[in-house]
Amino acid sequence: MEMMQRVYLSGPMSGIEELNYPAFNAAARDLRARGVHVENPAENSPPPCGTWQGWMRLALLQLARCDAIYMLPGWEKSRGATVEHGLAV
């Protein structure tokens, strides 16, 4: 039996309207429709500390469990997304 591929979504959030959640959720919906298991950081509960570093700790734990990363447009200008990309490739 073939295992479902697990993909982490990465892209800009900080400074973008609604934290760019609509773009994250649309990409997650499209990938899930193709049978991909998606790790979508836009679906995470806030970390207890509420800091950027806390959010990144959650994100990097998710990324470590994934087989691939899917980069949303504008990721190159995002500090967090460039960290995630650097770790994934």
Question: Where are the language model's segments positioned?
Answer:
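Conserved catalytic or regulatory cores that recognize and/or transform ribose-phosphate-containing ligands
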Residues: 1-89
